Protein backbone atom coordinates (compact mmCIF):
# COMPACT_ATOMS: atom_id res chain seq x y z
CA UNK A 1 0.00 0.00 0.00
CA UNK A 2 1.51 3.30 -1.07
CA UNK A 3 -0.53 5.78 0.94
CA UNK A 4 1.56 6.96 3.87
CA UNK A 5 -0.06 7.08 7.28
CA UNK A 6 1.29 8.32 10.57
CA UNK A 7 -1.35 6.61 12.68
CA UNK A 8 -2.67 3.25 13.73
CA UNK A 9 -4.44 1.34 10.96
CA UNK A 10 -7.75 -0.27 11.83
CA UNK A 11 -7.66 -2.69 8.93
CA UNK A 12 -6.43 -3.33 5.43
CA UNK A 13 -8.30 -5.08 2.63
CA UNK A 14 -8.56 -5.36 -1.12
CA UNK A 15 -11.92 -4.05 -2.32
CA UNK A 16 -13.36 -4.58 -5.78
CA UNK A 17 -15.98 -2.24 -7.26
CA UNK A 18 -16.81 -3.48 -10.73
CA UNK A 19 -13.54 -3.57 -12.65
CA UNK A 20 -11.81 -1.23 -10.19
CA UNK A 21 -9.80 -2.68 -7.35
CA UNK A 22 -8.52 -0.76 -4.35
CA UNK A 23 -6.22 -1.53 -1.48
CA UNK A 24 -7.87 0.11 1.49
CA UNK A 25 -6.56 1.08 4.91
CA UNK A 26 -8.83 2.64 7.49
CA UNK A 27 -7.52 5.10 10.04
CA UNK A 28 -9.29 6.32 13.15
CA UNK A 29 -8.98 9.56 15.13
CA UNK A 30 -5.69 11.11 14.21
CA UNK A 31 -3.44 12.53 11.56
CA UNK A 32 -2.81 11.11 8.11
CA UNK A 33 -0.23 12.31 5.62
CA UNK A 34 -0.86 11.11 2.10
CA UNK A 35 0.32 12.44 -1.27
CA UNK A 36 1.68 15.55 0.39
CA UNK A 37 -1.58 16.40 2.16
CA UNK A 38 -2.13 16.22 5.89
CA UNK A 39 -5.67 15.38 6.92
CA UNK A 40 -6.81 15.51 10.53
CA UNK A 41 -9.49 13.01 11.47
CA UNK A 42 -11.78 14.08 14.31
CA UNK A 43 -12.94 11.58 16.97
CA UNK A 44 -16.42 11.34 15.40
CA UNK A 45 -15.05 10.58 11.92
CA UNK A 46 -13.19 7.70 10.39
CA UNK A 47 -11.30 8.15 7.16
CA UNK A 48 -10.41 5.56 4.56
CA UNK A 49 -7.58 6.14 2.12
CA UNK A 50 -7.44 3.86 -0.90
CA UNK A 51 -4.85 3.45 -3.63
CA UNK A 52 -6.02 2.28 -7.04
CA UNK A 53 -4.25 -0.98 -7.82
CA UNK A 54 -3.54 -0.24 -11.48
CA UNK A 55 -3.05 3.51 -11.60
CA UNK A 56 -1.89 4.24 -8.04
CA UNK A 57 -4.50 6.99 -7.73
CA UNK A 58 -5.83 8.04 -4.37
CA UNK A 59 -9.45 7.43 -3.46
CA UNK A 60 -11.24 8.76 -0.39
CA UNK A 61 -14.04 7.69 1.88
CA UNK A 62 -15.10 9.59 4.99
CA UNK A 63 -17.68 8.07 7.32
CA UNK A 64 -19.44 9.58 10.30
CA UNK A 65 -18.91 6.94 12.99
CA UNK A 66 -21.64 8.46 15.18
CA UNK A 67 -24.18 7.17 12.67
CA UNK A 68 -22.80 3.67 12.71
CA UNK A 69 -20.01 4.31 10.25
CA UNK A 70 -22.33 3.76 7.30
CA UNK A 71 -23.07 7.35 6.36
CA UNK A 72 -20.26 8.70 4.27
CA UNK A 73 -18.85 9.53 0.89
CA UNK A 74 -16.89 7.24 -1.38
CA UNK A 75 -14.62 9.44 -3.44
CA UNK A 76 -12.32 8.31 -6.21
CA UNK A 77 -11.25 11.72 -7.49
CA UNK A 78 -7.90 13.42 -6.94
CA UNK A 79 -9.64 16.78 -7.01
CA UNK A 80 -7.96 18.96 -4.40
CA UNK A 81 -11.30 20.56 -3.52
CA UNK A 82 -12.58 17.19 -2.34
CA UNK A 83 -9.52 16.61 -0.18
CA UNK A 84 -9.91 20.09 1.28
CA UNK A 85 -13.58 19.47 2.03
CA UNK A 86 -12.70 16.23 3.81
CA UNK A 87 -10.07 17.97 5.89
CA UNK A 88 -12.57 20.67 6.81
CA UNK A 89 -15.05 18.07 8.10
CA UNK A 90 -12.80 17.37 11.06
CA UNK A 91 -12.82 21.00 12.21
CA UNK A 92 -16.51 21.88 12.00
CA UNK A 93 -19.40 22.16 14.43
CA UNK A 94 -22.53 20.05 13.89
CA UNK A 95 -24.25 22.83 11.94
CA UNK A 96 -21.17 23.39 9.82
CA UNK A 97 -20.83 19.64 9.28
CA UNK A 98 -24.20 19.57 7.52
CA UNK A 99 -23.08 22.33 5.16
CA UNK A 100 -19.73 20.61 4.59
CA UNK A 101 -21.45 17.31 3.76
CA UNK A 102 -23.69 19.12 1.29
CA UNK A 103 -20.63 20.70 -0.33
CA UNK A 104 -18.94 17.28 -0.52
CA UNK A 105 -21.96 15.81 -2.29
CA UNK A 106 -21.84 18.68 -4.81
CA UNK A 107 -18.12 18.14 -5.43
CA UNK A 108 -18.58 14.40 -5.86
CA UNK A 109 -21.40 14.97 -8.34
CA UNK A 110 -19.10 17.16 -10.44
CA UNK A 111 -16.12 14.76 -10.28
Predicted regions and their residues:
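Conserved, surface-exposed functional patches that form binding/active-site neighborhoods
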Residues: 58-61, 65
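Stable alpha-helical structural segments in soluble proteins, enriched in small hydrophobic residues
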Residues: 81-85
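Short beta-strand micro-motifs enriched in acidic
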Residues: 52-56
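A short, exposed loop/beta-hairpin motif centered on an aromatic-Gly-Thr core
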Residues: 65-79
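Anionic, Ser/Thr-rich low-complexity intrinsically disordered regions
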Residues: 86-108
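Short, solvent-exposed coil/turn segments at beta-strand boundaries
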Residues: 43-48, 65-68
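Negatively charged, low-complexity tracts enriched in Asp/Glu with abundant Ser/Thr
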Residues: 2-44
Amino acid sequence: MRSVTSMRLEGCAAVSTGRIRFYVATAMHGRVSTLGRVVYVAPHLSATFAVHEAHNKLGWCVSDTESGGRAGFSLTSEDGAIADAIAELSKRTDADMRRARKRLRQLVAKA
